[in-house]
Amino acid sequence: MGQSSSISSSNEEGSSHSKKFTNSKDILAYFNNKAQQQVTIPELVSFKGNLQIEDLNTPISHKALCNSLYFPQNHAMIVGIVTNMLRVLSNFPLMKSSYEPITGYGLLKCILLLNRARCAKFLKTKSYDQLKLLFISLSLQKTDKEELSEESENDGNKELTIKQIITGFDDVDTEMLCIPADFMLQFLTWLLILTVDCPTTNSKLDNTETHDQWGNFKVSALNLLRTMNPDVVGDIESHSITFQQFSTAIRTVMPNLLKPLENLMEHFFYLQHDLVDHDTNLSSIQDSKVMTPALLAQLSTGLPKELFIHKLQSLYIGRKSGFSMRSLQAKVFKWMAPSILVVSGMRITNSEEYAAEKNPRYRHFLEEFPKLKESDQMMDASHLNKRKTTFAVYIDDPWKVTNKDYFGDLNTRIIEISPRQDIYKVNQKGTIYFNTIGGGIGIGDKQPLIKPASKRYIPGNVSLTFDSTLEFAVFRNTGYGGSLDPGLLSMERKEENSPYELHFLIQDVEVWGCGGEKELEEQIKQLEWEEAESKRRQQINLRSLGEDRALLEMAGLVGQHQGGGSM
């Protein structure tokens, strides 16, 4: 349909993979031209229009970059982190050895490299380690040019193929790199805000309100930071994040973390009048103490991406309706679609002292719950030093009273939210009970043994247990053998057999409806229609000799023997 940027691009592509390069200039030129070939003519027109440039070799001003990325006011650190990241990526594939400023070509490469699908197409490989590239871009500092060693200068004469250049990461050794924890905290906070502000590639951005909540999002970002490095519990400035920590956490328990960054970068391909208003559904959670925009953003990093576009429905809020099984049952049991149970409280650090001196009800609970011995527990620093504890349970089935049996399908999962993030998936159906004869609520437990004069909880190896008064809860993790597997993060780190137990005093319990399949399908169709409409409005009739033709010539896309991007 559209004009090709190269008459014989397919032939050149085949021969270029065997082509060898000996100097940086040719390498950069090759990847710059290839980047332009990856985008459509309408995308290129919008890209140039947003940046107000005609030539892709034009350096992008700091002001234009900041305006396009909608950085928060008075947050110089995140501006520095992201602009440095983009400068590193703009010099791809010579991230370490090239110090060119960010040009139109460079920014095009940034957009492609930060988009998972576009990156695979751009580099012609699905196995490329995009997380390693991102980590390098966040680690390297492009302030002062390093003095090249004699060995590096001699390497300039080496012949390298495209594959060698791509997979070599410019000889950057990620084992020698790390990101300061305070830098990573700022970056994670910004990504969580983008989750709310930029849910799609074509949504209008008006982030003043969410930027005012930077502190709230920072709390959730701290949970993600401790997921990467559980030792970050005190002085953040004294800690750092390694590539192994960064990669492991994102791959296992926050696979959607970078999607909002993809969405933001795609905005360069839409002019302002092509953007659409998007309802982020935050009005329904404005009265919640727990289900805040920040917590919802954190949840969306690990749960299926469809969750965030669900119309969340407040079903039960303990602070309003009362902390009782009866109130929860009355509010929740008519809901016939998926739901999320959220519980938050303060960890009881000295059980015996608390039971003896402060809360006789807890002493009674300990008589019914078989507590792990302190000497048998192996908690990491985040669990030992942080008392705030929050869990969510995703439940696909409708709730029901189960005094003898269980409910819950294979999509049920427990998500640890604070002090770090981990995800515990079920390995069988029927893992939840709602016991109205004194047994409370259990996920991953066996039904309690209830007799006229006694009661005994039977916690599973991985389980979350609520007492019948919704005053106390216990999360147990002792490894394999139960109806839930150990956490994805724990298994990846080979820590699944490190037993621990979190007893906490419940402060909040809430249940939120996620919407049924029909509503979800309608919302997805609406989003797809909106994006298609934006693309349709974006299309320019290349045969027109009117204003559209003039715009293309001004942008240097047609006329004067110019080609363009692909269609």
From Swiss-Prot:
Localization terms from the record: Cytoplasm
Domain TLDc: 289-515
Signal peptide start-end: none
Keywords annotated in UniProt: Cytoplasm
PROSITE patterns in the cross-refs: TLDC
Presence of the UniProt keyword Transmembrane in the record: no
A GO cellular-component term linked to this record: nucleus
Major subcellular site: cytoplasm
GO biological process: protein-containing complex disassembly; response to oxidative stress
A Pfam match: TLD
Misc: Present with 2600 molecules/cell in log phase SD medium.
Primary role: May be involved in a process influencing telomere capping.
Membership in a protein family: Belongs to the RTC5 family.
Record's protein name: Restriction of telomere capping protein 5
Organism: Saccharomyces cerevisiae (strain ATCC 204508 / S288c)
